[in-house]
Amino acid sequence: MNGQITGETIKSAIACKLSNSTFTALESFKLYKEMTRQNFSLPAFFIWTVLVTQTKEAKNRFRLNYSMEVRFHPNTRDPVSYEKLCSVGTELLDYLETIYVPIQEIGSDGALIEVVRPVRGKQMEFKIVEDVLQFLVDYSIRAARPLEEIPDMQTLEINDMSKEAK
């Protein structure tokens, strides 16, 4: 979709931000944007779109809220410490506060150009459950749909003569 931010573009922006980040508690890690059931390498981040809500604001304008989850699974061979997971969670609060989402728009010459839009995270939180870090963040996007063209009024001829006059 041209010029539109979607759950997939947000997921890709999160993955890009994580891949370019340096975590003090981690040496290396894998990134997965899809649900992987088996054969994945640890330590790893998994990125999911949890919930998408849409709220109408005005005529053709609305707000989309993308609730995203980033899970960090540490290496099972390493002794996992609560402090290490807290350190990663705290760094995620900084790294994912603003992501940069690339979208395609139509330029003034009619050609498609790639534009990067900053999107701020809200209601960020993390918790540690069974040695897995679960990080939740909401990204809110304002959007507009093209207005439907309403045909111009046509003239209507009115016959004002009563039935008896005919």
Predicted ranges, named:
Residues 42-50:
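A short, hydrophobic beta-strand-centered structural micro-motif
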Residues 31-42:
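Short acidic low-complexity segments
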